[in-house]
């Protein structure tokens, strides 16, 4: 039953135009809910950027986050979003220098909500010092803590899932991490079928010959 369920979900997302990321419409990216301290206009751009991130549409994400900080120059999470858009874990790509330029603009985080502070502290680990794989693993642990701390935060679930997929590419526990990442993405789907991360992360999590049985009915 579980395998059939996964298979149906993947078919729905693969063949649904609603989830085509190369679109000019925010609605076609799906729906995300990520509360921040931003002004309303900046928040709208921020949400569009987050949805684009989950769709791997990084140029659009950069554009949206840049608009958000233009509307609200002190919007810390807008700079967080820009740094996130320079990290492409599934392709092992990262623009370390550009990301840190934007992260350096985040000053006093004590005025932010605790959740915002947690996200910013996590991304500072991602773009900290040291070997990239070590940073990736430490970031994934930080996102795991956020995921556990805020069990109703679907964005925490999504970004934790993605962090595991990034780490899985270079670890002996690859299949275990992919299954765990995929199961979390499926949980997101159950809570919000329109969330873009559910579609994309499930597909990438089970994109392996040894996991094909999870996506195909017996």
Named regions from a protein language model:
Residues 41, 75-76, 153-156, 194-196:
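Residue-level recognition of tetratricopeptide repeat
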Residues 67-70, 107-108, 147-148, 189-190:
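Conserved structural position within tetratricopeptide repeats
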Residues 39-53, 80, 118-124, 158, ...:
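Alpha-helical tetratricopeptide repeat
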Residues 28-44, 108-115:
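TPR-adjacent "capping" and linker segments in tetratricopeptide-repeat scaffold/adaptor proteins
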Residues 5-15:
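Bacterial N-terminal signal peptides
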Residues 55-63, 72, 82-117, 121-134, ...:
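Inter-helical turn/loop elements of alpha-helical hairpins
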């Amino acid at each position: 039953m579980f395998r059939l369920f996964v298979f149906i979900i993947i078919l729905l997302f693969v063949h649904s135009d609603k989830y085509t990321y190369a679109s000019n419409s925010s609605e076609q990216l799906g729906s995300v809910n990520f509360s921040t301290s931003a002004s309303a206009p900046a928040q709208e751009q921020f949400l569009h950027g987050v949805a684009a991130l989950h769709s791997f549409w990084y140029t659009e994400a950069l554009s949206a986050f840049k608009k958000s900080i233009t509307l609200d120059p002190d919007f810390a999470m807008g700079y967080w979003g820009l740094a996130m858009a320079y990290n492409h874990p599934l392709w092992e790509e990262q623009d370390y220098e550009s990301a840190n330029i934007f992260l350096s603009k985040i000053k006093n985080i004590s005025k932010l909500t605790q959740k915002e502070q947690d996200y910013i502290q996590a991304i500072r680990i991602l773009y900290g010092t040291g070997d990239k794989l070590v940073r990736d693993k430490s970031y994934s642990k930080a996102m795991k803590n956020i995921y556990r701390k805020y069990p109703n935060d679907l964005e925490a679930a999504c970004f934790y899932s993605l962090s595991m997929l990034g780490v899985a590419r270079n670890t002996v526990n690859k299949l275990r991490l992919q299954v765990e990442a995929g199961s979390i993405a499926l949980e997101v789907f159950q809570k919000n079928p329109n969330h873009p991360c559910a579609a994309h992360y499930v597909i990438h999590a089970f994109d392996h010959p040894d996991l094909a049985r999870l996506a195909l009915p017996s």
